Amino acid sequence: MQVRKRRGLLDVSTAVLVGILAGFLGVVLAASGVLSFGKEASSKGDSSLETVLALSFEGTTEGVVPFGKDVVLTASQDVAADGEYSLKVENRTSPWDGVEIDLTGKVKSGADYLLSFQVYQSSDAPQLFNVVARTEDEKGERYDVILDKVVVSDHWKEILVPFSPTFEGTPAKYSLIIVASKNTNFNFYLDKVQVLAPKESGPKVIYETSFENGVGDWQPRGDVNIEASSEVAHSGKSSLFISNRQKGWQGAQINLKGILKTGKTYAFEAWVYQNSGQDQTIIMTMQRKYSSDASTQYEWIKSATVPSGQWVQLSGTYTIPAGVTVEDLTLYFESQNPTLEFYVDDVKIVDTTSAEIKIEMEPEKEIPALKEVLKDYFKVGVALPSKVFLNPKDIELITKHFNSITAENEMKPESLLAGIENGKLKFRFETADKYIQFVEENGMVIRGHTLVWHNQTPDWFFKDENGNLLSKEAMTERLKEYIHTVVGHFKGKVYAWDVVNEAVDPNQPDGLRRSTWYQIMGPDYIELAFKFAREADPDAKLFYNDYNTFEPRKRDIIYNLVKDLKEKGLIDGIGMQCHISLATDIKQIEEAIKKFSTIPGIEIHITELDMSVYRDSSSNYPEAPRTALIEQAHKMMQLFEIFKKYSNVITNVTFWGLKDDYSWRATRRNDWPLIFDKDHQAKLAYWAIVAPEVLPPLPKESRISEGEAVVVGMMDDSYLMSKPIEILDEEGNVKATIRAVWKDSTIYIYGEVQDKTKKPAEDGVAIFINPNNERTPYLQPDDTYAVLWTNWKTEVNREDVQVKKFVGPGFRRYSFEMSITIPGVEFKKDSYIGFDAAVIDDGKWYSWSDTTNSQKTNTMNYGTLKLEGIMVATAKYGTPVIDGEIDEIWNTTEEIETKAVAMGSLDKNATAKVRVLWDENYLYVLAIVKDPVLNKDNSNPWEQDSVEIFIDENNHKTGYYEDDDAQFRVNYMNEQTFGTGGSPARFKTAVKLIEGGYIVEAAIKWKTIKPTPNTVIGFNIQVNDANEKGQRVGIISWSDPTNNSWRDPSKFGNLRLIK
C-alpha cells in the first residue's frame, strides 16, 4: 500500500490479511470489523468478493454528494490515507450534515455488504462518527444509524461497516451517509471508500421438515409427549405438538452433531404456535458441548413472545467455531412457562457460510490506555481464562489497558484440588502459576479468587473416606489445611484474596446461605476462613465477595458481617461483584458504597463488573440493539463517576471478562456485557469511561395516559395518571418535572421548573412532538414544537398549531401548563410518538432526550412516548378488622382482578379478586384467591402459593425502588416474607382457607406520606401459583405482565384514594 502521510499517522495494522481467496491479491476479510487493502478490489481472478463501489478522491469528488444544504466537499491535499488526495468535509451546520454515498440500484434488499472507509479528524479530541442508512421506498422515508464509532484526533482510522439493506420493491433511494453527529465545529476527511459484496453463491438448505411424515428424528426432551398433529399447521396438514410439560427446559429436540460442521454459520428458522389464551415466550435453544468446555452450555438462538392463536417465526443464526471438537449439538424448543403446550412447524437450517463476509481486527493501538486514564483513582483489572496466554491479540489488549488480573476459574477449589491421599489434600498449581508468571513479567498485580465458596468445590472435599459429611472439627482442620496451603503457595504474589464468596442469603433468618459449609460448621466457617488466611499471608488484603450487594436487605446483612470481622482485624475489604444489567438501579449501587465506606478503614473492590444489555431474562437479540449499547454506555459512565467519587475507598475495579465473546454470560444468549467487543475493539462503554463527552445521546422512553386538562396552571388529577418525566442538569440534579396526557389530537403538559434566576425573555420551556415517530435529520411536515417563555410569549414552527398556555409565578421556581393541538393528527391508544422537552435557563438548554439540543432541526434523538391507559382503580376510605373475615365495609369499595399474566394462563392458574381500603394509618387489602392446589414446599417464598402486594407511595414510577416503595408477601399459611422496603413492623395479615382457595386480609402501614382524599399511589398485587410438586407455574398480577414488580415500580397501576 502506498501511504502518503501529511499530518498524523495511518493505521495499517487494524486488519489482518486472511486468505479467503486463491490466486488473487485484493481485498481480504477476516473475523470482525476492519479491512486491509492490497491492490484495488476487483472481480478478476478467483476472488470471493466483488467491488460494488470504489472511490479514491484523486482530484475529484465524484461518487459522493453533500448531505446538508451548507456542506462543502472538496478533493483536498491537506492529508491523505492513500494517494495524493482525500475528501474534505467542511461547513457543517447541523449535527447530521455530512457525506452521502448513493447506492440506489447498486445493492439488493436482504443481501450482505461491507462499507469500508478511512476517516481523519484533527480537532484535538476524540469525535463520534456515524453511518446512517437512508431508505426511500413504498413504506416511506427512513434513516437508520448503523454505526457509532469514536475516532481519535490526528490519526487515519480505517472503519468497516457491515450492512444489509431492507426495502420494499424498487427503492427511490438507498444511500449511506457519513456524519459526525455530536459536533459541527471541525472538518473531517474521508479516503479509500469501498463497498464490497460476496459473490453470488447461494445459501444451502441442509435440513428441513414440516412434520408431514411424522416426528422423524425429533425426540422428547424430558418426560413429555411429542407427536405429529393435524390440529393446526403452519403449512401442509401437520405440525409437531409438545404436551405434558412440567419444567421449562422440557420440549422437543433433535441431535445435530452429525449435521452441523465446524467453522460455519447456520441460519435457523421455525414457526411456533400456542393457544393458552395469553401471550407466551417460546425459545429455540442449542445445547452444545465442545471438548474445551468444562460443562454443557445452553445458548438461546431466538426467543419470542407468541400471542395465543397465532403462528410466530423464530429465526436466528448460530456459529460453530473452526477448530473445535464437537461432543454434543442438540437443537430444542422450550418455554419459560413449564406447563405450556405448543406446536412447532417448518423447521429449516441453512448453511450461510458460503455467502458470509468475514472480518478480523487488531486491537486499537491509538486509543487511550484505560489504566492510564484511571491511574489517579484505582487499579483496573480484568478476569481471564488461561487461553488468553496463547493469543497475542488478547495479550496486547490486556497489557495495554489493565494493571490487575484475576483468574476466572483457575484459582477456585475445583481447579486447585487434585484429590486426597492418606488424609492429606493434593494440589495442582501449574495453571495458576502461569498467572503469577504473567503479572510478574508485565508489572501487574493479581487478585486471588476464591478460597471458600459453595460452588466449584468438589463434593468429596466435605466428606470422609466413607462418603459421610465431615464433623465440624474435621471440616475445620480441612479448611485450615486448604487455606494455609493455597495462600501459602502464593504468599507475597497474590495481593488480595476473595476469602469467602457469596455466603449471604437475605431470605434466611440469620441472613446466611444454607451451603454445605454452613450445614457442617454453622456460621463459624466465615470467621475461621479469614483467620486462617490472615495466618497464611499477613500482608495480603482479605475480602468478603458477593453479588447484588446493592440490594438493601442483602447490603445491610453484608455491612454487619464485615463490620464485625473488621473490628476483629480479620478483613480488609468488601468485594462488590456488580454483575448488573440495564435494569439495575445505579443509585442503589452508590447507596451501598456509601454505607460500606462508613466502616472504619474498609477498602472496596469492584470485583466482577459486567453489564448485560437486557432488562429481563427472556429477551434474546440476534444482534445487540444500538439503543441498548448506548444505554449501556451511559450507565457505565454513571457507574464510573460514582467509582471515582468514592476512590478514597474503592481501590480496584475489575471487569469480569476481556471481551464480549469471552463473557461467562454468553451461554443462553449474547449479553454483550463488557467494554471491548469480540473483535478486540473498544465499544461505546469503553468511551463512557475514557471520554464520556463523545457518547451519542440516549433516546429516552416513557409512557403517558389518556386524559384531558383545563389549562389554568394547576395540575389536574389526570396528570397524576402519567409517569413523571425528569429533565436533569449536568450534575444530575432535577431541573424540571413534567407530566403529560393525551386526547384526540392534543397533548397536555404540566411542569414545575427549578430556576434561580428571573430572566423572562431567556427562561422558558420547549415541547417537541413527532406524531409519526419517524426519525429524520430534518423536520417533517407533521413535526411540531412550541417554546413557551416565562414572559408568556410563544414560538411555534407551524401556524396551524393551537397552543394554550399558562406560566405560574414562583420564587426560584415556576410552574407551566400547555396544550398543543395538531390539526390532522389523531393520537391512538397503544401507539408511539416522538417527544422531547427542554428547559431554557438564562439561554442555556437542558433537554430530556436530545442532549445535543438540536430538536429544532431534526428528530433523530427525540425520545419515545407510548400512549396508553395505565391500570387505574379506587380505594374507598374505611377501616376493616384484619381477621380473615370479609367485613361489610369491603363491599363499599371497587373490586379489581388479577389478569396480567407473566406466567401461566387465566384459565389454569391462580387468580384473585381484590378490594382496597385506606385510612390515615394504613392501606388495607382484601384478596380472595382462587387456587384449588396449595403448596409451600419450595424454599423460595416467591415460588410458594402466595400473594404479593407492591406500593409506591409517591407514585414516581421509577425503574427502581425508592425509599417509599415496598414489596410485601404472605402465603396461604399466613407466613410473611418481604422484598425491598417491606418489613414485619408495617405488615399485618390474616389468612383463611376456603373451598378452592384462600382469603388474605392485609394492612400496610404508611411510611412516607399522610394520605388525603384524591391522593394517587402506585399499586400492584400479584398471585404466585405453585403446583403439587412445589414448582411455581403461575404469576398473575393486576398491572404488570413482566414479573418485574419486585425491582421495578414503573409498571405499577394507579390507585386513587377517595372518601
UniProtKB/Swiss-Prot annotation:
Catalytic reaction(s) noted: Endohydrolysis of (1->4)-beta-D-xylosidic linkages in xylans
Domain CBM-cenC intervals: 700-870, 871-1059
Q: Where is the signal peptide?
A: 1-30
Its Enzyme Commission number(s) read 3.2.1.8
> Which segments carry the region annotation A-1?
47-199
The residues that cross the membrane are none
> Please, one GO biological process term?
xylan catabolic process
Q: Which residues form the active site?
A: E502 (proton donor), E608 (nucleophile)
Task: Please indicate which superkingdom the organism of origin belongs to.
Answer: Bacteria
Q: Does the keyword Magnesium apply?
A: no
Keywords assigned by UniProt? Carbohydrate metabolism, Glycosidase, Hydrolase, Polysaccharide degradation, Repeat, Signal, Xylan degradation
The annotated region (A-2) lies at: 200-354
Cite a single GO MF annotation.
endo-1,4-beta-xylanase activity
| UniProt xrefs under InterPro entries | Carb-bd_dom_fam9 (IPR010502), CenC_carb-bd (IPR003305), Galactose-bd-like_sf (IPR008979), GH10 (IPR044846), GH10_AS (IPR031158), GH10_dom (IPR001000), Glycoside_hydrolase_SF (IPR017853)
Q: How does activity depend on pH?
A: Optimum pH is 6.2.
Explain how this protein's activity depends on temperature: Optimum temperature is 90 degrees Celsius. Thermostable.
All copies of the GH10 domain together span: 364-692
Report the family membership: Belongs to the glycosyl hydrolase 10 (cellulase F) family.
Q: What is known of its domains?
A: The C-terminal CBM-CenC domains mediate the binding of XynA to microcrystalline cellulose. CBM-CenC 2 alone can also promote cellulose binding.
This chain's protein is named: Endo-1,4-beta-xylanase A
From what organism does this protein derive? Thermotoga maritima (strain ATCC 43589 / DSM 3109 / JCM 10099 / NBRC 100826 / MSB8)
